[in-house]
A protein has these predicted regions:
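A short, charged
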Residues: 133, 226, 270, 337-340
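Anionic N-terminal interaction surfaces
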Residues: 192-290
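Acidic, Ser/Thr- and proline-rich intrinsically disordered linker/docking segments
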Residues: 287, 292, 299, 303-359
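Intrinsic-disorder/low-complexity loop/linker signature
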Residues: 14-18, 264, 270, 332
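Acidic surface patches and DE-rich sequence motifs
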Residues: 265-267, 294, 329
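Alpha-helix boundary/capping detector
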Residues: 123-124, 213, 324-325
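Eukaryotic alpha-helical scaffold "rod" segments
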Residues: 30-40, 249-270, 341-359
Length: 359
C-alpha cells in the first residue's frame, strides 16, 4: 500500500531485545511493513497493529504519539495529493488508519492541515505542468478552501515557475507575445492576477520593446519636421550628444587628503607640492536634443546645432549595451548619442533593420 515501503529489521541479540533501543525501532518498522504489505487499510485490524508492535515490546502511549502521527501523515499526503472527490476511498482509508493508530482528534486535524497545505502546493505545480486532472476551483472545493485561503500558495507556486523561465528571458533579453500569453494562461489556471513587482515589470517592458524592434512591422510616424520627398520617419526619441575626451584628474590619494582637510600642499622647505595627475578617457555629455531615424537618414536636432547623415554614408553602429549608440560614417568620424536606457537598444536594432532594408 502506498506510500509505505518495506523496511529491513535490524538484527539484535537477546540482551538488546531486553535492554536496548533496537526492539522499539523494529516495532515501528514492523508496523510500517504491515501497512506496506496490505492491499488497503480496511484489510488491517486493530489486533494486527498491536501484534506487530507487541513482538518487539511496543505499546501505544503518549510518548510515541508523534511516531503514530508520522505514519498517518504519510497516507494523508497521498490522500490529499491524489483524491479526486470528497468521497474518494482514500479519505475513508485515512479515517480508518487514524482509528487503528488511536490518534487524538487534534493530532488528526494538525496532520490533515499540514498534508492539505503540502498537497495544495504540489497540485498547483501539477496544474502548471499539465499533470493535474482537476482545475483549481475543483481543488479548492475538495480542500474546503475559498479564493483567499490558497491565494498566497498559488502566487508562490506561480512565482517559482516564473523565476525559472525568467532566467531564459533575461539571458535572451527578449519577451515575446507568446511568452506573455503563456504566463497569462498560467495565472488564469491558478486563478491569480497577472502582476509583478515594479522592477520585473520594467524589465519585461524593456525586453518586449527589444522583441518588437526585431519583429514588428515598422510603421511611419507623424512628426513636425520637414522631410525629403519619399522620406518617412520611424523613430523619434530624446537623446544627448556625447564626445569622448581625455581629461586629467588628481590621484585618488590626494583627493582623499583634501576631503579630510589634510594639508599636504607644502613641504618642509615651504615649496608648493604638485599633485600627480592621472589621464583617463571619458564620454562627456555635450548637450541634449532629438534623434530621428528615417528610411534614408539619421537626424540630430538641438537648440545649438543640426546633424544629418545619410544611411548610405554610414558604415554601421555600435551599442555599449547600456545607453550609448555610436554611429560610424565613411569619413571615419564617430557620432555618439546617449539615449534613455529603455530606448537605446531599440534604436540600435531599428537602425540596423532600416539600413539593411529589413522593414
Amino acid at each position: 500500500m502506498q506510500p509505505y515501503k518495506i523496511q529491513e529489521l535490524e538484527k539484535c541479540g537477546l540482551f538488546s531485545k531486553l535492554f536496548g533501543s533496537t526492539p522499539t525501532e523494529n516495532g515501528w518498522k514492523e508496523l510500517n511493513n504491515l501497512l506496506a504489505q496490505a492491499q488497503d487499510v480496511a484489510s488491517i485490524s486493530a489486533d494486527d497493529v498491536h501484534s506487530a508492535l507487541k513482538k518487539w515490546g511496543v505499546k501505544f502511549n503518549e510518548e510515541n504519539l508523534p511516531r503514530r502521527a508520522a505514519l498517518y501523515r504519510q497516507l494523508a499526503d497521498v490522500s490529499f495529493t491524489d483524491a479526486q472527490t470528497s468521497d474518494d476511498p482514500l479519505f475513508a482509508q485515512l479515517k480508518r488508519l487514524a482509528e487503528l493508530l488511536e490518534l487524538h482528534e487534534n493530532q488528526v486535524k494538525l496532520a490533515d492541515k499540514s498534508a492539505r497545505t503540502a498537497a495544495y502546493f504540489q497540485r498547483c505545480r501539477r496544474i502548471l505542468s499539465n499533470e493535474e486532472k482537476l482545475d483549481i476551483n475543483s481543488i479548492n472545493e475538495l480542500f474546503g478552501y475559498d479564493y483567499e485561503d490558497g491565494l498566497a500558495i498559488r502566487k508562490q507556486v506561480f512565482q517559482a515557475h516564473f523565476n525559472l523561465l525568467f532566467e531564459d528571458i533575461v539571458k535572451e533579453a527578449r519577451y515575446s507575445p507568446e511568452q506573455e500569453a503563456g504566463f497569462r494562461k498560467d495565472c488564469e489556471r491558478l486563478d491569480i492576477p497577472y502582476e509583478f513587482k515594479n522592477n520585473i515589470v520594467s524589465a519585461l517592458n524593456k525586453y518586449r520593446s527589444l522583441w518588437d524592434a526585431e519583429n514588428r512591422k515598422l510603421e511611419p510616424l507623424d512628426i513636425d519636421l520637414p522631410l525629403e520627398k519619399g522620406e518617412v520617419c520611424y523613430v523619434h526619441v530624446n537623446c544627448g550628444l556625447c564626445q569622448n575626451k581625455v581629461v586629467e584628474r588628481e590621484d585618488n590619494y590626494f583627493e582623499l587628503t583634501r576631503k579630510f582637510n589634510i594639508d599636504e600642499t607644502v613641504n618642509f622647505k615651504g615649496e608648493k607640492l604638485e599633485h600627480p595627475k592621472i589621464k583617463e578617457e571619458i564620454t562627456a555629455l555635450l548637450e541634449l536634443g532629438h534623434f530621428f531615424l528615417t528610411n534614408t537618414r539619421i537626424i540630430y536636432l538641438s537648440q545649438k546645432q543640426a546633424l544629418a547623415k545619410r544611411l548610405d554614408d554610414l558604415t554601421g553602429a555600435d551599442f555599449d549595451g547600456i545607453n550609448i549608440v555610436t554611429f560610424h560614417d565613411k569619413d571615419k568620424q564617430e557620432h555618439l548619442l546617449k539615449f534613455p536606457d529603455e530606448a537605446a537598444g531599440v534604436v540600435y536594432i531599428l537602425f540596423k533593420r532600416v539600413k539593411n532594408k529589413e522593414i
